[in-house]
């Protein structure tokens, strides 16, 4: 904990300059958090699209032996493989892009921490133990949300696909409309999961941003 200094003894010009530096770095940090959260939610969407395709392809593969085979089976296989490969490439490209964004965010966090530490003990009476953990908590949230979401999405899709297959086998009616309805239900379930995951992620990121705004507003006045 740094020694507190009487505000009356602070050089106003020096204080103004230091606050300006802090605010400029805060603006950069806030922008990076926004961009990173956008990238992460984009990856969540792409990841769930890939997983939905994989899930629907597994479902298709499991039930196609019970349906009259035709040329459309081979065409469907080719389309599914092509789209899946393209989306997987897109997913991993965005994952590495997000990791790069998180690395930049970490760099700004360290730089801002250094700036704040220079202010500690000089004039603003900011304490490292009170300030820094909030930023690194936000960084950790952004870094760990995507893997958790993908694991959750993969597990959910496996269960949904398995249950869908069991329902089709139980009904035992090789009806294309039934398969189509099952696929639509699968997409609706995935869309619901996607909505809830994105909402949860956005709320968490916004909560961290609100904490940062509140803290900075109180400390630099």
Swiss-Prot record:
Record's keyword terms, sorted: Cell membrane, Membrane, Transmembrane, Transmembrane helix
Cellular component terms (Gene Ontology): plasma membrane
Spans traversing the lipid bilayer: 41-63, 78-100, 141-163, 178-200
Bilayer topology annotation: Multi-pass membrane protein
Superkingdom of the source species: Archaea
UniProt entry tagged with the keyword Transmembrane: yes
Protein name: Uncharacterized protein AF_2214
Originating species: Archaeoglobus fulgidus (strain ATCC 49558 / DSM 4304 / JCM 9628 / NBRC 100126 / VC-16)
Phylogenetic lineage: Archaea, Methanobacteriati, Methanobacteriota, Archaeoglobi, Archaeoglobales
